[in-house]
Every structure is written in C-alpha cells, then in structure tokens.
C-alpha cells in the first residue's frame, strides 16, 4: 500500500506553490508599508504557553491541540495559533526594552486536531500581524486596515467586518455575573462542555457551536451594556478612527473569539458566512507570559481560506514564467556548449532550462512550451560553426538572430 499524507494535511505541489509565493510577497510588501518586520518561531512550544495564553477552558486547549511528551518527559504542543509564540519570543528576547511600538508579521503553520472542513485543515497556515506597546485605539484601526487593504488589492468583494468590545477583566466580571444569572435559567439545556464553562469562564459559552447553546445565547445580555467607561471610550474611539479611514463595519455584540487572551477590541472579517480573518487586542497576555504589563493587538489570516475565497470568486493569481530561456541542443558537442552558456546566463540571474534527457528537437520544443519558457533556442553543429543562433519568442514565434558569444545582447532581451 502506498503511503499518503495524514488526514487533514495537504502537499503544496509546484503547480500551486506560485499562488502561495504571490500572496506571501504581497503580504510582505503590505506589512513593510506599516513598518512591520518578520518573526519566525518554533513549530512546537511547551504546552504551558498555550494553557496560560489561550486559556484552559477553550476548545483549542481542551480538544484541539496536538500534545505529547518528549523523551525528557516535558509536555510539548504543536502550535495551534501564532500569537502566543510571538508574545513568548517578544518576552524572551526582551524586546520590551526597545523603543515601542514593536511591529511584527509572520507566516506560520498551525496544527489543530479538529474536523476537516472547507478551507480548514488540521495543518493550515496563517499570515499574522502583532503590534506591541501601543494602547490607543488608533493602532487597532491600523491593524484592521491591513486586511482591508489586502482584500482590496486582491479584488475580493463582499467581505464584511464585524467588531465588538469584550471589555477588560474589571468590567467583564460584572458582565459574567449577569450572563451566569441569565444562563442559569437554561443550565440543564447547556452542553456538557458549557456546563463546565459556566463557573470557570461563562463568556466562552457565547462561542459554543452546539445548536442548543447557540439558541440559548441569542437572548443573552449584551456585553457592550456592561463595559466600563474606559473600555467604552476605547471602543467609541475605534469606531471614529474606522470612520475616518472610510472602513465600513458592523457592531456584533456576540463576537468573543475562541481564545481567552483577548480584551477590549475583537473583530472578524466574514465572507459567505465564513470567517477568513480575525483578531483583537490582548493587553494582558504579555504579562501573563512573564513580561511587563504592556498592551498589544493583532490578527491572524488563514491562507488556505483566502485561496479558497479567491477560487470561489474566480479571481486568478498570475503565474509568472519560471523559465526565461529554454536551451535546446543537438549532439554531445552542442550539449557542452549549452551547459557553459546556461551557467553564464544563470550567473546573471537568467532562469534557464536545458535538456538532460536526450530528447528530439521536437520533444524539446514541446517541453519548452509546457513549462512556459519565454524564449527558446537550439544549438546544433551549424550554430556552433557559424556562432549564430535563432532566439525564438514562444508567445508569438517571432525569431531574431543573436551571436552565441554576445552574452550582454542576450541579457538585454531578458531584462
């Protein structure tokens, strides 16, 4: 029996990788426009990081993490999200001693043991932005504007932005009491997981995906009615900044996000009832992980879901030719010359392909066409004797004669 990739994973083949490269380059350029620099963190962390950061009562920690003991008996988890590792690196690297804010971006695989579904695999990939050290709502608006710009540049229409404030620990305590009072009337109808959450973290019940629980929370108290003046002012400021930036949004008081580290601002970008990007503020996570008290805000965007959206919207990602010149040859002597010529051109960063298979000229040209080469030429005995060769533009068949030794002339064609 042939081996297959594990369930919930997918190989990225050369026929698809150009799409990822295109998006990654676009993300990098946009992140740089906002002053963000790249961070890379390990694919696994100590389990405690996610227990403390994401939250013991969350579905991520309770049900979805890939956790195991290493040979030294330490509990290790494949990272299920990108923010906690970025914060851990920020603290461990003592970047809080630098002038703030610190702006980071990353591309990372994340692993969650969950049902494989449309646009979500057990190993999927995220593009994320994290900004540390700024508490003003203007940075929340700036972070939100990044996905807005990405979707606009890609031509994705119909994306809705939903925002909410879940307050701070002080005002959330008051809300939790009101929420528990409401939920107690239907306690027996809650799922077993939410019954556990009832005492430990009732806010998580608002995020439950079980139909009976979703029905119960429809008439639950609105958290915006309970947030303190400071959190209220922050949320009103955010809305004002979004208005100034001409970013349309809807206030959804039931957005709480599935991770415990969020405070104040939370947001989701939704298209066709699917969340394709989400984030918020996490002003207490840095301190929770061992750093100083410092505000932060960020988001994560699923790359697979974005690619699926582009496909459904019939938005094509341009595929650049990955070969500038196909160098064909006839005979062993010509092959030696082609090898030397290819080396000279590659040294000048011209992408070349040559024949290693001993194919006929017809088969070589067929291959050149299949790989999307921009130009082709074939060296044989006649070309070696005259020092001249026909350079063919594959797009329209137009040919020009060039001197084999005039490398600079060839370079000009490709530049």
Curated annotation (Swiss-Prot):
Q: What is its EC number?
A: 6.1.1.21
| Pfam families linked | HGTP_anticodon (PF03129), tRNA-synt_His (PF13393)
Q: What class of enzyme is it?
A: ligase
Q: Which InterPro entries match?
A: aa-tRNA-synth_II, aa-tRNA-synth_II/BPL/LPL, Anticodon-bd, Anticodon-bd_dom_sf, His-tRNA-ligase, HisRS-like_core, HisRS/HisZ, HisRS_anticodon
Q: Which domain of life is it from?
A: Bacteria
Member of which family? Belongs to the class-II aminoacyl-tRNA synthetase family.
Q: Give the protein name, as stated in the record.
A: Histidine--tRNA ligase
């Amino acid at each position: 029996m042939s081996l297959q990739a594990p369930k919930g994973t997918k190989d990225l083949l050369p026929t698809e990788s150009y799409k990822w490269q295109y998006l990654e380059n676009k993300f990098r350029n946009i992140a740089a426009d906002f002053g963000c620099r790249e961070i890379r963190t390990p694919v696994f962390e100590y389990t405690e990081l996610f227990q403390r950061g994401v939250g013991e009562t969350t579905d991520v920690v309770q049900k979805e993490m890939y956790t195991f003991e290493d040979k030294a008996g330490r509990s290790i988890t494949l990272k299920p999200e990108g923010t906690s590792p970025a914060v851990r690196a920020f603290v461990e690297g003592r970047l809080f001693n630098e002038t703030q804010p610190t702006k980071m971006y990353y591309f990372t695989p994340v692993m969650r043991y969950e049902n494989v579904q449309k646009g979500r695999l057990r190993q999927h990939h995220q593009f994320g932005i994290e900004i540390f050290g700024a508490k003003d709502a203007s940075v929340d608006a700036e972070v939100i504007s990044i996905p807005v710009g990405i979707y606009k540049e890609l031509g994705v229409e119909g994306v809705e932005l939903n925002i909410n404030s879940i307050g701070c620990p002080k005002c959330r305590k008051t809300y939790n009491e009101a929420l528990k009072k409401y939920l107690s009337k239907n306690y027996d109808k809650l799922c077993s997981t939410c019954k556990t959450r009832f005492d430990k973290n009732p806010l998580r019940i608002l995020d439950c995906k079980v139909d009976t629980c979703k029905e119960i929370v429809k008439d639950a108290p609105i958290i915006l009615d309970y947030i303190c003046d400071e959190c209220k002012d922050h949320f009103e400021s955010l809305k004002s900044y979004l208005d100034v930036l001409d970013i349309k949004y809807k206030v959804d008081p039931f957005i709480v996000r599935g991770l415990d580290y969020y405070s104040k601002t939370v947001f989701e970008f939704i298209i066709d009832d699917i969340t394709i990007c989400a984030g918020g503020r996490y002003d207490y996570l840095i301190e929770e992980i061992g750093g100083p008290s410092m505000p932060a805000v960020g988001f994560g965007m699923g790359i697979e879901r974005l690619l699926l959206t582009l496909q459904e919207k019939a938005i094509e990602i341009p595929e650049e030719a990955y070969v500038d010149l196909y160098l064909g040859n006839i005979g062993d002597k010509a092959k030696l010359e082609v090898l030397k010529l290819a080396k000279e051109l590659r040294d000048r960063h011209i992408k070349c392909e040559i024949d290693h298979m001993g194919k006929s000229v017809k088969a070589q040209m067929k291959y050149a066409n299949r790989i999307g080469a921009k130009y082709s030429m074939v060296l044989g005995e006649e070309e070696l004797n005259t020092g001249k060769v026909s350079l063919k533009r594959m797009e329209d068949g137009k040919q020009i004669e060039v001197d084999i030794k005039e490398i600079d002339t060839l370079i000009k064609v490709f530049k």
